């Protein structure tokens, strides 16, 4: 009854032509629905208190609370709270909270909390948190947290948290943590942490950490840590299974395979007294190289089938003429398969060291011989299974 009385009195007051034109002074807007309210919507009116179910007003300088939604044609300074959505045609300075969406046509300065989507058509300064996505048309500065997605059309700085992806159209400064993908169309300064991949189209200064890969389209100044790391130029550290730079490296690569455009990928076929028949791929740079491969019959040919995978990393130096001297350290994982039923351990590992002498016959073929020492050990206990001198020899195909 009180609300009905206020609506009736407000409506009669608005219809009184002898009074000041409604909406040109700050007022109270109690609203049941669009057009059913104590304050009519015009192009100059201000509202300092709004309560209702669904409200439409020109400008809000104060508090607005609605069951369904609130629509403000120009700007909001204060607090806008709605069960479903808040829409501001201009800029908001203050706090917005809605069950589904907050939409600002221009700037957001303050805090925006939405169950699904938070949108700022131009810039966002402060906190924007949404269950599904946050979207900023131009710049963002502060904290963006989207359940799935953060999108900043141009530059962004601060902390970004997203369940799926964080996308910045230009430069990003700060910390971006995403479940799958971190993407910056320009340069990054700070940290990019992603479950799948980080991509910076320009330079990257700081740390890139990803479960699968990191990509820098310009110069890396810092550290890349992932399964695969790639940069046009690198000044720092690349740590991963596969590391690649295109133009220059002023730093260090630590990985199973370290490559650049001058890396030669070579096929190696060889035999030895550890695993008897072996095939491997050698990734050879000017001085350093890595070898990844596998071999069969770690045990004797008279035993059942056994096999191993190996990785070696070393340094090669030209000796004289067509001869090259190299040395490497290696790790070998050994599977005995059905031999475990005959008393052998099901799997072993071996640590090995080798000195290699290589003779290049032509531009496409070379012969090599290796000697070294190694020992195989149990995974399950601190004991040696076998140890001794290593002897190998074979051919390298360029």
Residue ranges and their predicted role:
Residues 45-47, 221, 233, 271-277, ...:
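Residues that define the transmembrane beta-barrel architecture of outer-membrane proteins
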Residues 61, 91-92, 107-109, 124, ...:
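Repeated loop/turn-to-beta-strand initiation elements of outer-membrane beta-barrel proteins
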Residues 16-82, 90-93, 108, 124:
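N-terminal targeting and processing segments
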Residues 51-53, 227, 239-241, 256, ...:
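Residues on the lipid-exposed face of transmembrane beta-strands in outer-membrane beta-barrel proteins
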Residues 57-60, 73-74, 89, 105, ...:
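Solvent-exposed loop/turn segments connecting transmembrane beta-strands
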Residues 55, 69-71, 85-87, 101-103, ...:
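Transmembrane beta-strands of outer-membrane beta-barrel pores
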Residues 1-18:
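Bacterial Sec-dependent N-terminal signal peptides
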Residues 51, 99, 113-115, 131, ...:
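Membrane-embedded beta-strand positions of outer-membrane beta-barrel proteins
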């Amino acid at each position: 009854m009180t609300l009905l009385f206020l609506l009736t009195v407000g409506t009669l007051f608005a219809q009184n032509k002898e009074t000041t034109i409604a909406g040109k002074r700050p007022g109270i807007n109690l609203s049941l629905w669009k057009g059913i309210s104590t304050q009519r919507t015009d192009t100059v009116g201000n509202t300092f208190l709004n309560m209702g179910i669904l409200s439409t007003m020109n400008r809000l300088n104060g508090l607005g609370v609605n069951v369904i939604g609130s629509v403000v044609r120009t700007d909001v300074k204060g607090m806008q709270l709605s069960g479903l959505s808040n829409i501001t045609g201009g800029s908001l300075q203050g706090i917005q909270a809605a069950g589904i969406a907050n939409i600002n046509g221009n700037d957001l300065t303050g805090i925006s909390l939405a169950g699904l989507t938070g949108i700022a058509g131009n810039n966002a300064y402060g906190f924007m948190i949404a269950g599904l996505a946050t979207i900023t048309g131009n710049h963002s500065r502060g904290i963006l947290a989207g359940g799935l997605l953060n999108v900043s059309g141009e530059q962004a700085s601060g902390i970004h948290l997203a369940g799926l992806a964080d996308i910045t159209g230009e430069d990003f400064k700060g910390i971006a943590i995403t479940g799958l993908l971190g993407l910056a169309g320009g340069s990054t300064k700070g940290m990019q942490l992603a479950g799948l991949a980080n991509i910076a189209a320009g330079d990257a200064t700081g740390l890139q950490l990803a479960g699968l890969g990191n990509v820098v389209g310009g110069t890396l100044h810092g550290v890349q840590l992932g399964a695969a790391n790639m940069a046009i130029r690198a000044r720092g550290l690349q740590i991963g299974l596969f590391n690649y730079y295109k133009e220059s490296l002023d730093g260090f690569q630590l990985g199973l395979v370290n490559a650049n455009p001058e890396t030669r990928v070579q096929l190696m076929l060889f035999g030895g007294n550890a695993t008897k028949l072996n095939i491997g791929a050698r990734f050879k740079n000017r001085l350093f190289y890595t070898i990844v491969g596998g071999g069969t019959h770690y045990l004797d040919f008279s035993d059942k089938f056994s096999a191993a995978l190996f990785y070696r990393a070393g340094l090669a130096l030209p000796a004289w003429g067509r001869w090259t001297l190299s040395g490497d350290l290696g790790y070998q994982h050994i599977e005995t398969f059905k031999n475990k039923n005959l008393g052998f351990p099901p799997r072993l590992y071996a640590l090995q060291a080798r000195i290699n002498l290589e003779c290049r016959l032509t531009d496409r073929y070379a012969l090599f011989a290796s000697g070294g020492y190694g020992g195989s050990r149990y995974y399950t206990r601190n004991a040696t299974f076998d140890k001794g001198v290593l002897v190998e020899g074979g051919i390298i195909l360029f």
